[in-house]
Amino acid sequence: MVRERKCILCHIVYGSKKEMDEHMRSMLHHRELENLKGRDISHECRVCRVTEVGLSAYAKHISGQLHKDNVDAQEREDDGKEEEEEEYFDKELVQLIQERKEQSRQDEPPSNSQEVNSDDRQPQWRREDRIPYQDRESYSQPPRHHRGPPQRDWKWEKDGFNSTRKNSFPHSLRNSGGPRGSSVWHKGATRGSSTWFLNHSNSGGGWHSNNGMVDWNYNGTGRNSSWHSEGTGGFPSWHMNNSNGNWKSSVRGTNSWNYNGLGDKFQQGRNRNPNYQMEDMTKMWNKKSNKPSKYSQERCKWQRQDRDKAAKYRSPPEGYASDTFPSEGLLEFNFEQRESQTTKQTDTAASKINGKNGTKARDKFRRWTPYPSQKTLDLQSALKEVIGSKSDTLEKPLFNFSLITAGLRKPVDKTSNPPVIKTQKAGPPGSPSHKAISDGTAFCEVARACSITEQSEPHQKSNKIPLLKSPLLPLPTPKSGPHKQNLKNRSKNKETKSFPSGDHSHLLNTSTLEGSHGSSYTSKSLGLCPRVLKENKTVSGTQKEPDEKLNNTSQKAQDTVLQCPKTLQNPLPTTPKRMENDAKESSVEESAKDSLSIESQPHSAGNSAMTSDAENHGIKSEGVASLTTEVVSCSTHTVDKEQGSQIPGTPENLSTSPRNSTVLQKEAEVQVSAATSPHSGLLLDLKTSLEDAQDNNLVKSDGPFETESFEDTSLDTELQKPDLNNQPPGTLLPELSKLGFPASLQRDLSRHISLKSKTGTHLPEPNLNSARRIRNVSGHRKNETEKESGLKPTLRQILNASRRNVNWEQVIQQVTKKKQELGKGLPRFGIEMVPLVQNEQEVLDLDEEPDLSSLEGFQWEGVSIPSSSGLARKRSLSESSVVMDRAPVYSFFTGEGTGKENEAQQSPSPNTALSAAQSQKTAMYLEQEVAPLTPSVGTGERVGNIPTQRRHSAQLPSGHIMPVMHSARDLHSQERSTPLSERHAQESTGEGNSLSSNASSGHAVSSLADAATDSSCTSGAEQTDGHSIRKKRRATGDGSSPELPSLERKNKRRKIKGKKERSQVDQLLTISLREEELSKSLQCMDNKLLQARAALQTAYVEVQRLLVLKQQITVEMSALRTHRIQILQGLQETYEPPEHPDQAPCSLISREQRNSRSQTSFETALLPAPFFPGFLDPPPSHASLPSPGNPLQITMSTFQAHGTAPDSSVQIKQEPMSPEQEGNMNALPQGCASNVSKELLQTNRVVDDGSSVYPAIPAVIASESTENCQEVSKDLNFSVEQGNSRSKGNSPSCQSPDLPGINRGEETAKGSSGSEACSSSFLRLSFTPETPAEKETQSPADQPEQQAESTLASAETRGSKKKKKLRKKKTLRATHVPENSDTEQDVFTAKPARKVKTAKAAKGAKVTTSQTGQEQGTARDEPDSDSSLEVLEVTNPQLEVVAIDTSESGDEKPDSPSKKDAWIAAEQNPIETSRSGCDEVSSTSELGTRYKDGVPVSVAETQTVISIKASKHSSEISSEPGDDEEPTEGSFEGHQAAVNAIQIFGNFLYTCSADTTVRVYNLVSRKCVGVFEGHTSKVNCLLVTHTSGKSSVLYTGSSDHTIRCYNIKTRECMEQLQLEDRVLCLHNRWRTLYAGLANGTVVTFDIKNNKRQEIFECHGPRAVSCLATAQEGARKLLVVGSYDCTISVRDARNGLLLRTLEGHSKTVLCMKVVNDLVFSGSSDQSVHAHNIHTGELVRIYKGHNHAVTVVNILGKVMVTACLDKFVRVYELQSHDRLQVYGGHKDMIMCMTIHKSVIYTGCYDGSIQAVRLNLMQNYRCWWYGCTLIFGVVDHLKQHLLTDHTNPNFQTLKCRWRNCDAFFTARKGSKQDVAGHIERHAEDDSKIDS
């Protein structure tokens, strides 16, 4: 059943919250409202929290952009809170409507009338509420849950929840998605309500395990605790712990079954009902959107009074989560009422404060969810299925399942349970049962509210989904968005005050709060008790009727809550409240805190909770001031009560504690320390330092919420419990992520979470709408002043975040996106991560944690929570990583990222989070310090410290954690005060110190840093799981590696460190300008060098002089770059140079270490010692030493990339840092130089092997530079090495004939105008096939060198080249061989050599030998490009155009061949290819460029260079000389699944498929002549290339995380290379194999020995989709296409980010580099051409109807393959579509062109070969069709499939000038085909 929402005013029923919200905002509804109340009434816009007088004014408002933006934002928020039920009608309105509907209600059946009439429903709800309350009272919470839930369950089920378990779940999913429908559901009738609740519970329903159990319901809310109890026998524990509270903890399930309406019915029986859970979730969400105040106040009133009314909307769910719930609502498990109460309360509070109908505003708030609703629906649907299936399984096993899913589920359970436990523990042991109930209820309420709120964000559906997920990651996703917000606000309040109050309590509360941030925050969850008291008091005036009833239960609940106020209190303040009412909340919280402090630490926790509650309430009400006062008073009141009930609650806590601790322990294996003796430890913790424990709880609570959001309550709780002390939930979240849910669970979780976290992140593509919606995601109305303020929507949203339950992730995402649009965050991923976990929804693609640097002021807790929502956000991250990227991860963890608006409050809050284990004061202190520190501290440091602390918290006593926190704080402050570079160093040192000081802290820190980083970027689960979860797409491979990349990416994306010192930025700017000048002068030097060489006169001497000059400039540049990088690092506060990538080549060990570090969180361990030695030792010994100068440059660039993370980073190319990298940077800052040095040295060694080529002079210079810069940046070494390699390349070319020559030649060719010479070389080389002897001669001479030297050095060679060039030109007539531009020269240099080699390789492979250094490597690498046709065998005498390679040459030589050059380049490419082994396959990068369904689709794997002019003739030459026979057209059979990549090498067609095999076909016979097996998963890419001599090897990359190297002759697997993630694309050049992984990294291998060289963190957590190479002067470029919609241009030697090419709106699937241009095909159905060197978007080719999977350039034409089953041929210059080739039965996954034959591989496993003939054109003259086919049969197929319907009844032939008419009766169906085919044959041919 889909939960329905009914507008009791308009009598319209909606199936989703979104629809209901849209209706509630609509003029239709407001007209009815005016009809009901009279003209000129106040129309409140819930979304904007603005009241307009009169319908016209309201109409004007809703048509405004601000409102639309707010709606978008709220929808986003509600995406996560979909479960939450909103009150769409306040009490007054409900009464009015009820009166008006009294008659109709009486007329209608009871259920309908109830749904329709508030009165009916009210009584029923009241009765039900009372029953639940009575039950609760009689059961004293645990019993209540125990018995009550079953009672309710059965009752509800009877009422219509019976089917809920099956149908209701889905229903509830949908309904939860539509809190608006809440009222409808409630109204529907008790029965309807029950259905509603079931719907709410649907999460529970999905989790039927909760069905009969309260626990499940809790789970439903998405709190782990409920799951734990549910799944297991823990149910009683939960009951004891929080019969109510627990349920509350499991906000998701709790609300529904526990609370009001449904809750009442459900209350006890329902408690277990999955549906209840869903309702709970819905309520929670509603609460979240309603905000605590509403919850609190209205819960009391609404629970009873409005339960009938509000129950209609949200009453049932709200009942439980409403603020009043804590005291009475807690006892009453009327989620619905609670929700409605919350809504009402919020409205009431608003009314009180604003003097208007708060509910109305609330309703509108709920209405925001409209957009989220849709997503919610989707999520719900998904969840329904998932939950439905899981639910039944989980219902009973839920608890067990939770435990089993430890990482995923357990954490959820844990969170739910631990919160309960904590709450009970926090509370004194006065009345265990009662307290457990009260506390638990309160907490559950909070949790539920939080969960609902968060889920509300994703949508209530999302919430339900989270419930579904809940078993795995119950709350993570739904909570993630709202959760974060709640957590942030709550974190602020809670962490500042609540954290100290009670660890366990806090945890529970926090969980609850997080779950029901919006409603709970108002004092729903956190302030359960306080809120109940507060809310009851506050609401008492408004909701006296419910209050009276609630007051009894509420009294108990309050007492209980009071007992667990610490718990509630802590969570509450920190949750939404703080965010909602930043200043006010803070003050209120402060006052409350003071009161609490006065009371006692334990009590103070309670007080804080109360205060938080009050604050939350106030926030919700929107009358911040009034509410604040009210809150304060309530807070005090609550505190008193809390004190009273705290003691009784302790036993409950204790009782819960064991169970909790068990869960926690399991989950906290990582973070067991804090919760060490989960039972006694936690209790002791609470008792010994209630403040500390409370802090812990708060932190944990935040963490758990985050975890819920992120992973699950269980994870959250675990993190919270153990590590909350250390770090804000954000940090814990990552830890949780690492807890190790099963990879599959994690993946699912991430997907769900990301979906939930991001309202619109279902798709893999970036969801801009999602980002936009984020702004208003808070779901709470903003103050009118805020609405009306002229602030930008995003800013306003951020500022109002505390007030509203903002999904900070989304907010950040939006901000980041905007900044990026402005060019601010330019880069790493110029696009928002698609779905925020887009396709993958892996939220690792969840990794939507934007760079929080922009939100530096935000409260860490809040941020943490988002981080906690990591799972949801994991996906988001990927998808919305852009958003989160903006805020540094550390900020994210520290809270600086989230609470811009709450910066002041946030400061304390983060501290609290950090020192959760510490005393309240300490926590507050830390928060205060951390908040400031966070902004300044680098992501790395903060993340590192906090994660470490978090982890330690789990592993070490709170004492340890505290020190860590302090150290982190100190570090932050230090960093703040120190200059960037200094700070960087300090950060490194501080981090290292804190880490080391914590014993295993080092590892923990690095791990945590990684995790934290990752968690923000990736999903918490992934992070925590690092290893197991790494598999999530977002952060795959190395858990930390992906994570770090995520982080890195975040940083890069955000790239805005608003708080970074401007001076640093200015400095950076100055240095950058200077560096630019120098780089220009360097280019000039290169040009001069080339000219000098070309001149050959005094060239040699001159070249030497110029080389020296160049070296000097390079060294100076390196120094500058180093300085700049340091500054950038300081800005980023993360000093993790991409040196890792740089180092990677030199030290596989380093990379591996790094990976292991990321995975095992041993980054720290890796750090200083190992790297230092390595750095120190290798540099001097290797040529790399000389290269340090250059490495410095590189380092600078690398750092620059890092540094670009800050505001200025946008301009500076920032290398996206993977979480791992970032973590490394954090860990490495101190020993960074040394570490990197080591790695660099290793790299240098590697380079030495292949870099011995470099001249000694450069080495010397480099060594000097290295010595100077070694410590400056380890990256420098690498960079220097790179630079040296370049320089060496030049000088060696002079010095050493072979390698140096090659390098020099290559360099010269690349570097300078040697383009002419290069062109000649190319021509000659490309023509070499023509003259094998000549080719051989030149080839032996080192084609690269030959090119460079012969072109530049020997006139003779040059002349010969020119001759060849001329000859070739003649031969190629159409193959234009224009001179290569400087940019191209390198490319062409390599290519000509390659070409020569191709010819030679094919013939003698002499070129291979001669091709030393880069050239040979290039040739080898070049073979990757299938498209590069080898001119070698211009077998076709008709055209020497043999060299007409496909655009492979583009890949090979992106330099500047003109279009003609492109042809030549293509030719050259083939030569290189052939040299590589006669490999005509398009570059591997192309092969791996495109991915479909995660399967790489080769882009233009074999691009035949058919000059268009010579295109008719098969001008391409296959790599091997034996390709004399012409390939035949037809099909190749054998594959059983999608063909992912295709390459032609030696007259054979190599294909790889998802059927795990690679097949080899003969091009002539088309028979399969061999099969390569061994992979265990789909093979995504392949690359055939030459190795030493004539031997050739096949590399295959697979989703089984391996690359296998086969001997192509014996077909034996020679080696298997293990990688961290799925291998999506391969590319080779310069004797290096580049592998693009799904975690966003590029790993390089030496083709000679298959040794790993480097790891470049490029686009993590988003996958690398395709690779290509190019050259820029002497610099070798690696072009990386990614799923984040951007293409990054990097230094191929060290991975340094040079620039980012943006423009695509979806995943980049394929690339082809030609001359200076990169042609990229994307899922956005377009092909873009960018200038590689400037980053400028030159042109866009449209006309595709689906994703473009392959792009090939053949001369002047571009051939593209598309998923719409067509191959299109475009003219490059005019953009005209020349031809279309069809005939495919499925989507084209890969394509290559060889000898004018197009080879395509399809998704169904079919492979076809079709002749490319531009001379034959068959036009489709069907009306409106403009396609021109190259094959008549394709036209026929097109006509029959696209223009006719096989089932037509009547058909009119719409061919030009034809009016034939066919009918099915005439039996003319057969005639149709014949008729149409005749048209095709007779009338279609057009003269060309």
UniProtKB/Swiss-Prot annotation:
Q: Which residue numbers delimit the C2H2-type Zn fingers? A: 5-29, 43-67, 1818-1843
What segments bear the compositional bias annotation Basic residues? 481-491, 1050-1060, 1360-1373
Q: Name one GO molecular function term.
A: zinc ion binding
Q: Where is this region: Disordered?
A: 68-187, 287-326, 338-362, 410-437, 453-525, 537-617, 635-661, 696-728, 894-920, 968-1064, 1281-1461, 1468-1487, 1509-1531
Identify residues that carry Phosphothreonine. 1036, 1383
Q: What is the effect of changing residue 717 to A?
A: In strain: C57BL/10
Q: Where is the signal peptide?
A: none
- Give start-end ranges for the coiled-coil region(s): none
Acidic residues bias spans: 75-89
Q: What is this protein called?
A: Zinc finger protein 106
Question: What is the species listed in this Swiss-Prot or TrEMBL entry?
Answer: Mus musculus (Mouse)
